[in-house]
Protein backbone atom coordinates (compact mmCIF):
# COMPACT_ATOMS: atom_id res chain seq x y z
CA UNK A 1 0.00 0.00 0.00
CA UNK A 2 2.84 2.34 0.90
CA UNK A 3 4.63 1.39 -2.30
CA UNK A 4 1.46 2.10 -4.31
CA UNK A 5 1.03 5.49 -2.65
CA UNK A 6 4.67 6.35 -3.26
CA UNK A 7 4.35 5.35 -6.91
CA UNK A 8 1.20 7.41 -7.27
CA UNK A 9 2.89 10.47 -5.78
CA UNK A 10 5.83 10.01 -8.12
CA UNK A 11 3.50 9.79 -11.11
CA UNK A 12 1.70 12.94 -10.00
CA UNK A 13 5.01 14.75 -9.56
CA UNK A 14 6.07 13.82 -13.09
CA UNK A 15 2.70 14.96 -14.45
CA UNK A 16 2.95 18.24 -12.59
CA UNK A 17 6.50 18.85 -13.80
CA UNK A 18 5.65 18.16 -17.45
CA UNK A 19 5.61 21.44 -19.36
CA UNK A 20 3.33 22.10 -22.31
CA UNK A 21 2.20 24.97 -24.51
CA UNK A 22 -1.04 24.81 -26.49
CA UNK A 23 -0.74 26.62 -29.81
CA UNK A 24 -3.50 27.52 -32.29
CA UNK A 25 -2.12 28.72 -35.62
CA UNK A 26 -3.10 28.95 -39.26
CA UNK A 27 -2.67 25.81 -41.37
CA UNK A 28 0.60 25.42 -43.30
CA UNK A 29 2.16 28.26 -41.33
CA UNK A 30 5.23 26.89 -39.54
CA UNK A 31 8.21 24.68 -40.22
CA UNK A 32 7.51 21.45 -38.24
CA UNK A 33 11.23 21.27 -37.43
CA UNK A 34 10.87 24.52 -35.46
CA UNK A 35 8.40 22.82 -33.13
CA UNK A 36 10.67 19.79 -32.75
CA UNK A 37 13.72 21.96 -32.03
CA UNK A 38 11.82 24.06 -29.48
CA UNK A 39 10.77 20.96 -27.55
CA UNK A 40 14.26 19.45 -27.74
CA UNK A 41 15.82 22.62 -26.36
CA UNK A 42 13.28 23.54 -23.69
CA UNK A 43 11.55 20.29 -22.79
CA UNK A 44 8.22 22.03 -23.40
CA UNK A 45 5.81 19.89 -25.40
CA UNK A 46 3.85 21.72 -28.08
CA UNK A 47 0.20 20.78 -28.58
CA UNK A 48 -0.41 22.27 -32.02
CA UNK A 49 -3.80 22.79 -33.67
CA UNK A 50 -4.68 24.70 -36.83
CA UNK A 51 -7.50 26.78 -38.29
CA UNK A 52 -8.12 28.45 -41.64
CA UNK A 53 -10.47 31.33 -40.75
CA UNK A 54 -10.23 34.19 -38.28
CA UNK A 55 -13.88 33.64 -37.40
CA UNK A 56 -13.06 30.16 -36.10
CA UNK A 57 -10.39 31.54 -33.78
CA UNK A 58 -12.55 34.45 -32.66
CA UNK A 59 -15.47 32.20 -31.74
CA UNK A 60 -13.21 30.19 -29.44
CA UNK A 61 -11.64 33.27 -27.88
CA UNK A 62 -14.89 35.10 -27.20
CA UNK A 63 -16.48 31.97 -25.71
CA UNK A 64 -13.61 31.82 -23.19
CA UNK A 65 -11.61 28.86 -21.91
CA UNK A 66 -10.29 28.11 -25.38
CA UNK A 67 -7.55 25.94 -23.91
CA UNK A 68 -4.88 27.71 -25.94
CA UNK A 69 -1.79 29.54 -24.72
CA UNK A 70 -0.60 31.09 -27.99
CA UNK A 71 -2.89 32.11 -30.85
CA UNK A 72 -2.32 33.89 -34.16
CA UNK A 73 -5.04 36.44 -35.00
CA UNK A 74 -4.90 38.72 -38.02
CA UNK A 75 -4.53 42.37 -37.04
CA UNK A 76 -8.03 43.59 -37.81
CA UNK A 77 -9.46 40.78 -35.66
CA UNK A 78 -6.80 41.40 -33.01
CA UNK A 79 -7.95 45.02 -32.77
CA UNK A 80 -11.49 43.99 -31.90
CA UNK A 81 -10.37 41.18 -29.60
CA UNK A 82 -8.06 43.47 -27.61
CA UNK A 83 -11.03 45.76 -26.98
CA UNK A 84 -13.06 42.73 -25.87
CA UNK A 85 -10.38 41.93 -23.28
CA UNK A 86 -9.55 38.41 -24.46
CA UNK A 87 -5.75 38.83 -24.38
CA UNK A 88 -3.23 39.51 -21.66
CA UNK A 89 -0.44 42.02 -22.08
CA UNK A 90 2.83 40.48 -23.18
CA UNK A 91 5.48 40.40 -20.47
CA UNK A 92 8.25 41.97 -22.51
CA UNK A 93 10.82 41.11 -19.84
CA UNK A 94 10.36 37.49 -20.93
CA UNK A 95 10.83 38.28 -24.61
CA UNK A 96 14.58 38.69 -24.95
CA UNK A 97 14.37 38.61 -28.74
CA UNK A 98 11.87 41.45 -28.99
CA UNK A 99 14.65 43.75 -30.18
CA UNK A 100 14.71 41.82 -33.46
CA UNK A 101 11.34 43.15 -34.60
CA UNK A 102 11.10 45.23 -37.77
CA UNK A 103 10.28 48.80 -36.62
CA UNK A 104 8.19 49.59 -39.70
CA UNK A 105 6.04 46.49 -39.22
CA UNK A 106 5.71 47.14 -35.48
CA UNK A 107 4.58 50.69 -36.29
CA UNK A 108 1.95 49.42 -38.72
CA UNK A 109 0.78 46.85 -36.17
CA UNK A 110 0.49 49.55 -33.49
CA UNK A 111 -2.47 50.97 -35.42
CA UNK A 112 -4.38 47.88 -34.26
CA UNK A 113 -2.58 47.35 -30.94
CA UNK A 114 -1.46 50.72 -29.54
CA UNK A 115 1.93 50.40 -27.91
CA UNK A 116 2.29 46.84 -29.22
CA UNK A 117 1.14 45.64 -25.81
CA UNK A 118 -0.80 42.51 -26.74
CA UNK A 119 0.86 41.13 -29.85
CA UNK A 120 4.06 40.79 -31.80
CA UNK A 121 4.07 40.17 -35.54
CA UNK A 122 4.62 36.61 -36.72
CA UNK A 123 4.12 36.88 -40.49
CA UNK A 124 2.65 39.36 -42.94
CA UNK A 125 1.54 39.12 -46.52
CA UNK A 126 -0.80 40.32 -49.24
CA UNK A 127 -4.07 39.17 -50.76
CA UNK A 128 -3.69 38.86 -54.52
CA UNK A 129 -4.14 36.57 -57.50
CA UNK A 130 -2.53 33.16 -57.96
CA UNK A 131 -2.78 31.47 -61.33
CA UNK A 132 -1.69 28.63 -63.58
CA UNK A 133 0.59 30.22 -66.18
CA UNK A 134 -0.26 27.75 -68.95
CA UNK A 135 -4.01 28.16 -68.42
CA UNK A 136 -3.61 31.93 -68.38
CA UNK A 137 -1.75 31.95 -71.72
CA UNK A 138 -4.29 29.62 -73.30
CA UNK A 139 -7.03 32.10 -72.40
CA UNK A 140 -5.28 35.46 -72.71
CA UNK A 141 -2.73 34.68 -75.41
CA UNK A 142 1.04 34.04 -75.32
CA UNK A 143 1.80 37.59 -74.20
CA UNK A 144 -1.08 37.76 -71.74
CA UNK A 145 -0.51 38.85 -68.16
CA UNK A 146 -2.46 39.02 -64.94
CA UNK A 147 -1.58 42.31 -63.29
CA UNK A 148 -4.98 43.85 -62.60
CA UNK A 149 -8.13 43.16 -60.57
CA UNK A 150 -9.92 43.44 -63.94
CA UNK A 151 -9.30 39.73 -64.42
CA UNK A 152 -11.35 38.95 -61.30
CA UNK A 153 -13.96 41.66 -61.03
CA UNK A 154 -15.00 41.98 -64.67
CA UNK A 155 -17.39 39.04 -65.19
CA UNK A 156 -16.45 38.54 -68.83
CA UNK A 157 -12.78 38.13 -67.87
CA UNK A 158 -13.26 35.74 -64.96
CA UNK A 159 -15.63 33.65 -67.07
CA UNK A 160 -12.67 32.72 -69.28
CA UNK A 161 -11.24 30.73 -66.36
CA UNK A 162 -14.47 29.12 -65.22
CA UNK A 163 -13.82 25.85 -67.04
CA UNK A 164 -10.39 25.29 -65.46
CA UNK A 165 -11.47 26.19 -61.93
CA UNK A 166 -11.61 29.40 -59.91
CA UNK A 167 -11.33 29.49 -56.13
CA UNK A 168 -11.73 32.44 -53.80
CA UNK A 169 -10.92 32.90 -50.13
CA UNK A 170 -13.87 32.22 -47.86
CA UNK A 171 -13.10 35.50 -46.13
CA UNK A 172 -15.41 38.49 -46.38
CA UNK A 173 -12.69 40.58 -44.73
CA UNK A 174 -10.39 39.95 -47.69
CA UNK A 175 -12.76 39.81 -50.65
CA UNK A 176 -15.22 42.61 -49.79
CA UNK A 177 -12.45 45.22 -49.25
CA UNK A 178 -10.87 44.13 -52.55
CA UNK A 179 -14.19 44.69 -54.31
CA UNK A 180 -14.64 48.08 -52.63
CA UNK A 181 -11.12 49.11 -53.64
CA UNK A 182 -11.75 48.02 -57.24
CA UNK A 183 -14.86 50.21 -57.30
CA UNK A 184 -12.84 53.20 -56.14
CA UNK A 185 -14.41 53.10 -52.68
CA UNK A 186 -12.74 53.02 -49.29
CA UNK A 187 -11.84 49.37 -48.56
CA UNK A 188 -12.68 50.11 -44.92
CA UNK A 189 -16.10 51.58 -45.67
CA UNK A 190 -18.95 50.57 -43.36
CA UNK A 191 -21.51 52.50 -45.37
CA UNK A 192 -24.28 49.99 -46.22
CA UNK A 193 -24.64 51.49 -49.70
CA UNK A 194 -20.93 50.94 -50.42
CA UNK A 195 -21.06 47.41 -49.05
CA UNK A 196 -24.10 46.60 -51.16
CA UNK A 197 -22.29 47.87 -54.26
CA UNK A 198 -19.40 45.52 -53.47
CA UNK A 199 -21.85 42.66 -52.95
CA UNK A 200 -23.52 43.37 -56.29
CA UNK A 201 -20.14 43.21 -58.01
CA UNK A 202 -19.33 39.91 -56.32
CA UNK A 203 -22.72 38.45 -57.21
CA UNK A 204 -22.00 39.16 -60.88
CA UNK A 205 -18.78 37.11 -60.82
CA UNK A 206 -20.19 34.40 -58.52
CA UNK A 207 -21.15 32.01 -61.39
CA UNK A 208 -17.48 31.67 -62.32
CA UNK A 209 -16.29 30.77 -58.81
CA UNK A 210 -16.15 27.04 -58.22
CA UNK A 211 -15.47 27.20 -54.49
CA UNK A 212 -14.94 29.54 -51.56
CA UNK A 213 -12.31 28.07 -49.23
CA UNK A 214 -9.32 29.45 -47.38
CA UNK A 215 -6.90 26.52 -47.49
CA UNK A 216 -7.85 23.93 -50.12
CA UNK A 217 -6.60 26.08 -52.98
CA UNK A 218 -2.98 25.59 -51.95
CA UNK A 219 -2.87 21.94 -53.04
CA UNK A 220 -5.52 22.31 -55.74
CA UNK A 221 -3.51 24.98 -57.56
CA UNK A 222 -0.29 22.98 -57.25
CA UNK A 223 -1.96 19.87 -58.67
CA UNK A 224 -3.49 21.71 -61.62
CA UNK A 225 -7.02 21.07 -60.35
CA UNK A 226 -7.80 24.80 -60.45
CA UNK A 227 -6.24 27.58 -62.49
CA UNK A 228 -6.97 30.83 -60.65
CA UNK A 229 -7.48 31.91 -57.06
CA UNK A 230 -7.83 35.07 -55.04
CA UNK A 231 -5.69 34.03 -52.09
CA UNK A 232 -2.88 34.82 -49.72
CA UNK A 233 0.62 35.46 -51.04
CA UNK A 234 2.51 32.86 -49.03
CA UNK A 235 -0.01 30.10 -49.67
CA UNK A 236 0.22 30.69 -53.40
CA UNK A 237 4.01 30.74 -53.18
CA UNK A 238 3.87 27.43 -51.28
CA UNK A 239 1.66 26.08 -54.06
CA UNK A 240 4.25 27.20 -56.59
CA UNK A 241 6.96 25.39 -54.65
CA UNK A 242 4.94 22.18 -54.31
CA UNK A 243 4.26 22.08 -58.04
CA UNK A 244 7.98 22.43 -58.74
CA UNK A 245 8.81 19.68 -56.26
CA UNK A 246 6.18 17.40 -57.81
CA UNK A 247 7.63 18.02 -61.30
CA UNK A 248 4.09 17.84 -62.66
CA UNK A 249 4.50 20.53 -65.30
CA UNK A 250 2.27 22.99 -63.46
CA UNK A 251 3.71 26.51 -63.36
CA UNK A 252 2.21 28.85 -60.78
CA UNK A 253 2.66 32.60 -60.48
CA UNK A 254 1.38 35.27 -58.10
CA UNK A 255 0.34 38.84 -58.83
CA UNK A 256 -0.17 41.82 -56.57
CA UNK A 257 -2.54 43.81 -58.83
CA UNK A 258 -1.33 47.20 -60.00
CA UNK A 259 -4.35 48.93 -58.43
CA UNK A 260 -3.17 47.77 -55.01
CA UNK A 261 -4.05 45.00 -52.59
CA UNK A 262 -4.58 44.30 -48.94
CA UNK A 263 -1.57 43.96 -46.64
CA UNK A 264 -2.32 41.83 -43.59
CA UNK A 265 -0.49 41.02 -40.37
CA UNK A 266 -0.77 37.73 -38.45
CA UNK A 267 0.39 38.05 -34.87
CA UNK A 268 1.36 36.10 -31.77
CA UNK A 269 -0.86 36.73 -28.75
CA UNK A 270 -1.55 35.08 -25.40
CA UNK A 271 -5.19 34.64 -24.29
CA UNK A 272 -6.11 36.13 -20.93
CA UNK A 273 -7.08 32.71 -19.56
CA UNK A 274 -3.99 30.86 -20.86
CA UNK A 275 -2.94 28.08 -18.48
CA UNK A 276 0.75 28.03 -19.39
CA UNK A 277 1.83 31.65 -19.49
CA UNK A 278 5.57 31.12 -18.96
CA UNK A 279 5.64 28.44 -21.64
CA UNK A 280 3.68 30.72 -23.97
CA UNK A 281 6.25 33.49 -23.58
CA UNK A 282 9.06 30.97 -24.11
CA UNK A 283 7.46 29.81 -27.37
CA UNK A 284 6.87 33.36 -28.63
CA UNK A 285 10.43 34.33 -27.73
CA UNK A 286 11.77 31.29 -29.56
CA UNK A 287 9.85 32.27 -32.71
CA UNK A 288 11.42 35.73 -32.47
CA UNK A 289 14.93 34.35 -32.85
CA UNK A 290 16.26 35.57 -36.22
CA UNK A 291 17.29 32.15 -37.49
CA UNK A 292 13.97 30.61 -36.39
CA UNK A 293 11.89 33.34 -38.02
CA UNK A 294 13.94 32.85 -41.19
CA UNK A 295 13.42 29.09 -41.13
CA UNK A 296 9.67 29.62 -41.00
CA UNK A 297 9.67 32.21 -43.79
CA UNK A 298 11.85 30.01 -45.97
CA UNK A 299 9.30 27.20 -45.73
CA UNK A 300 5.94 29.01 -45.69
CA UNK A 301 6.96 31.80 -48.11
CA UNK A 302 5.55 34.64 -46.04
CA UNK A 303 7.44 37.75 -45.00
CA UNK A 304 7.99 38.05 -41.26
CA UNK A 305 8.18 41.03 -38.93
CA UNK A 306 11.69 40.19 -37.76
CA UNK A 307 14.23 42.51 -39.35
CA UNK A 308 17.21 40.61 -37.93
CA UNK A 309 16.03 37.43 -39.67
CA UNK A 310 16.64 38.76 -43.16
CA UNK A 311 20.31 37.77 -43.22
CA UNK A 312 19.19 34.15 -42.69
CA UNK A 313 16.38 34.15 -45.26
CA UNK A 314 17.02 32.39 -48.56
CA UNK A 315 17.92 34.92 -51.25
CA UNK A 316 15.21 33.55 -53.53
CA UNK A 317 12.60 34.31 -50.86
CA UNK A 318 13.96 37.71 -49.85
CA UNK A 319 14.29 38.86 -53.47
CA UNK A 320 10.80 37.65 -54.43
CA UNK A 321 8.65 40.78 -54.76
CA UNK A 322 5.54 38.69 -54.29
CA UNK A 323 6.76 37.94 -50.75
CA UNK A 324 8.76 41.06 -49.91
CA UNK A 325 7.21 43.77 -52.13
CA UNK A 326 9.34 46.66 -53.33
CA UNK A 327 8.75 50.20 -52.08
CA UNK A 328 6.54 51.18 -55.02
CA UNK A 329 4.27 48.19 -54.43
CA UNK A 330 4.20 48.79 -50.68
CA UNK A 331 2.88 52.28 -51.35
CA UNK A 332 -0.11 50.76 -53.16
CA UNK A 333 -1.05 48.37 -50.36
CA UNK A 334 -3.93 49.13 -48.03
CA UNK A 335 -4.80 47.74 -44.61
CA UNK A 336 -8.17 46.76 -43.18
CA UNK A 337 -9.47 47.85 -39.78
CA UNK A 338 -11.86 46.06 -37.46
CA UNK A 339 -15.53 46.67 -38.18
CA UNK A 340 -18.02 47.48 -35.46
CA UNK A 341 -20.32 44.56 -34.60
CA UNK A 342 -23.31 45.94 -36.49
CA UNK A 343 -21.31 46.43 -39.69
CA UNK A 344 -19.63 43.04 -39.32
CA UNK A 345 -23.01 41.31 -39.05
CA UNK A 346 -24.18 43.17 -42.14
CA UNK A 347 -21.07 42.11 -44.08
CA UNK A 348 -21.47 38.51 -42.90
CA UNK A 349 -25.07 38.43 -44.15
CA UNK A 350 -24.01 39.84 -47.51
CA UNK A 351 -21.20 37.30 -47.72
CA UNK A 352 -23.56 34.39 -47.07
CA UNK A 353 -25.87 35.69 -49.78
CA UNK A 354 -22.96 36.04 -52.22
CA UNK A 355 -21.79 32.48 -51.62
CA UNK A 356 -25.18 30.77 -51.57
CA UNK A 357 -27.15 33.01 -53.90
CA UNK A 358 -29.83 33.44 -51.22
Feature-to-residue mapping (PLM):
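Sec/Tat signal peptide C-region and signal peptidase I cleavage site
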Residues: 9-15
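Early extracytoplasmic/lumenal segment of secretory-pathway proteins
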Residues: 16-81
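Hinge/lid segment of periplasmic solute-binding proteins
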Residues: 17, 79-126, 145, 150-153
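Short beta-strand->loop
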Residues: 88-99, 150, 246-262, 271-274
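Ligand-binding pocket segment of bilobal, Venus flytrap-like solute-binding proteins
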Residues: 160, 167-255
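Conserved C-terminal helix/tail region of periplasmic/extracytoplasmic solute-binding proteins
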Residues: 219, 327-358
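Mature extracytoplasmic/periplasmic domains
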Residues: 266, 271-332
Amino acid sequence: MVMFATGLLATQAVAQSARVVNVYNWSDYIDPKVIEDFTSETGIKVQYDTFDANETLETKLLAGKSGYDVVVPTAYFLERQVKAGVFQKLDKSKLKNLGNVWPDIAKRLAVYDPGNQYAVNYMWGTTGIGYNVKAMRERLGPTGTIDSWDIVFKPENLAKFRDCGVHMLDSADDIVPAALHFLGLNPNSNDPKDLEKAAELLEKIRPSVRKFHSSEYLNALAAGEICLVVGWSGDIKQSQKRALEAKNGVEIDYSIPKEGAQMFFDNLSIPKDASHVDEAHAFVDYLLRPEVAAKNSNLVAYANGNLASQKFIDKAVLDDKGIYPDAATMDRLYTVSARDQKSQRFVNRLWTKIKTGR
